[in-house]
Amino acid sequence: MNYALDNGHKWNVMVGRYDYELGNNMGLIYGNNFDGAQLKFADNKMAATVGYGKFKEGDLNDSKTAYGELEGFFGGGSVAGSAVGVYYNDFNASSGVSAGDAKVWGAYASLNFAKKFNLNAEAYRVNYDKASVADADGFSAKLKYGKAKFDTPKSWDLWVNYINIEDGAADDSGTGSWRTNVNNTKGWAAGADYTFAKNAQLQVFQTFDTKIEKTGKDRDELTRAQFVFVF
């Protein structure tokens, strides 16, 4: 259930199962099904979100979490639509075969510039309470030119992306990323999106120079193409 609490639609409550991207940006740690409740306030300058519930996919399945997000929106002209945000999670996490309480602290910045460019960067830390489980950091950056919109046929974009995710800083079975491997991974990727009809898009992805973050050994590269339809 998604319900606006006021006529101006600034206050919104969501209850039940919904798609949750941890950090409300790239969803690297987790971006999948979630059972819970969320309260959000948003206007054209800022947004504040709090929520509580259970992850329903991956290694984090059935782990409970409380989360909070604070975002600010800014810019005019070619910078319009830019944003910065911080987020916090407190949950029962899982890293390989080791599990324990953990806290996530993160921040992101999404900057529009030069009319058609966007630079999106995110950094976070997973602090495990259990002494035997090492804390883990994650970083990702994506530079994009253009903007493929589902409601705008023939719109397109090109992008390049870099990630450096330490072991224990992502859930490969629940991540919102298109990559096969996110946890314990560093490397580059490039891709393109093209809207060939309204609500229909072709997306292509290619990784390169992908390594296991902990050892520096090569990972298998991934080539992927997909059609996405929205209704």
Where are these regions (language model features)?
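Outer-membrane beta-barrel pore domains
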Residues: 10, 77-88, 92-231
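Outer membrane beta-barrel
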Residues: 1-85, 135-172
